[in-house]
Amino acid sequence: MPELTVVMPVYNEEGAISSVLAQWSEALQALQIDYQIAVYNDGSKDGTLPAIQTIAQKDPRIAVVDKPNSGHGPTILKGYHDHLGSSWIFQIDSDGELGPEKFVVLWSNRAAYDFLIGNRICRKSPLSRKITTWISRGIVWLFYGRLVFDVNCPYRLFRPSLLKEYLLQIPLDTFAPNLIIAGLAAHLRLRVFQTDVVHTDRRTGEVSIKKWKLFKAARASCRQTILFRWKVW
């Protein structure tokens, strides 16, 4: 296993994925890290899969996992399970909304921390997403502990060895496992580092969950987050 595994779920990002992978590869190489980018294609219906396969053929540090569509949460959870042997796991989404500029801040502070995460700023989200973010934060703070601010931020670096026991207990169909993991960081009193990361609007593609479906998904994820808390303790 490499020292760092980047878990990157992708769904219908044909227009962005080549640029995103190029940016992250350049940033990681500049830091001289022993890394692998594991790209999980979650049943994309556009040209995403052939695009990432072409890139992977030229770069052995990019691994492609093609899987049936199951959703963002189950996909990143599979990525975590597949790479529990890595010293570090970093999760980032493939839409380009969070760039690699602040990764060096996380990586350079890793020796003193167990869980390092971004706090999205300049985020131009619709009211519906802001509401679900507030609710998610409240649930995690209430049931796990008030520590991580941006509880669902897909810009997180952590030591899987400290979370392995719990990661394997999270149900595979969990909608937002990152909420639970942020809660675990607080409950287990991990050493947590947080830093602001600039959020930019996506230039291609579109969000997969909108309006009423977003609230239904948020309700399900909050329920799963609460139930896991009582299941484990």
Predicted regions span which residues?
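A conserved acidic beta->alpha catalytic loop
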Residues: N41-P50, G96
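Short, well-formed alpha-helical segments that are part of the catalytic scaffolds
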Residues: E13-L28
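Acceptor/aglycone-binding surface of glycosyltransferases and processive sugar-polymer synthases
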Residues: K67-H83, W88-Q91, G99-F175, R202-W212, ...
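Donor nucleotide-sugar binding loop of glycosyltransferases
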Residues: E13-A16, S44, H72
